Design a protein with these regions (language model features):
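Hydrophobic beta-strand-centered segment that forms part of the acyl-chain substrate-binding groove
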Residues: 1, 9-11, 109-145, 149, ...
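A structural microfeature
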Residues: 8-11, 172-174
Length: 175
């Protein structure tokens, strides 16, 4: 899609082979939330005196108290992964009663950056996202969202985020 003459988004269909690590439990992710950079004061270079890594972000920003997704990932397993206990909301439901795909894609956005941050690497904003939705997530169901570092090619860091349902089933993943 374009804004004026500037390309702002592009999509294509393709394969997405990715080894997705097993998630922690919802309770384990929830217990770690207090160490998430999403709650750190002055964690953002661009929003001084605010709380959070990206305070205004719809996905991870705590400034979106009423309308955000609250995917506040915290480091686990010796900083090898980050995870967030994500409480989806009933009022988000699409016609089938599921979390809309646009919210799943959004939930996959920030955990990759949080994974690099947990490893002591500060990255920029997301530049590219390839995702696959395997199973719908019923609106209102608790989920675990994870992120892990895949590697760096040149100056581009690559991460893998994933969404798991309350049974631990992989519902969506990205790179």
């Amino acid at each position: 899609s374009n804004v004026g003459e500037k390309l702002t988004a592009q999509a294509q269909i393709g394969e997405l082979p990715l080894d997705v690590p097993m998630p922690p439990s919802f309770d384990e992710a929830h217990a770690a939330r207090h160490i998430s950079p999403a709650y750190a004061r002055n964690a953002s270079r661009h929003c001084p005196d605010k709380i959070g890594f990206h305070p205004l972000c719809f996905c991870c920003g705590v400034e979106h108290e009423e309308d955000g997704l609250h995917v506040t990932a915290a480091p686990l397993r010796n900083n090898e992964i980050v995870a967030a206990a994500w409480k989806t909301q009933l009022h988000w439901a699409d016609e089938a009663g599921n979390v809309p795909a646009r919210f799943l894609w959004t939930a996959l956005d920030c955990p990759g950056q949080f994974a690099f941050y947990a490893g002591g690497i500060r990255t920029g904003m997301l530049g590219q996202l390839a995702a696959r939705i395997e199973h719908p997530v019923p609106a209102g169901d608790p989920c675990v969202v994870t992120g892990w570092r895949i590697g760096v090619q040149g100056q581009r860091p690559y991460a893998g985020p994933a969404v798991f349902d309350q049974r631990g089933r992989l519902c969506a993943y990205a790179k």
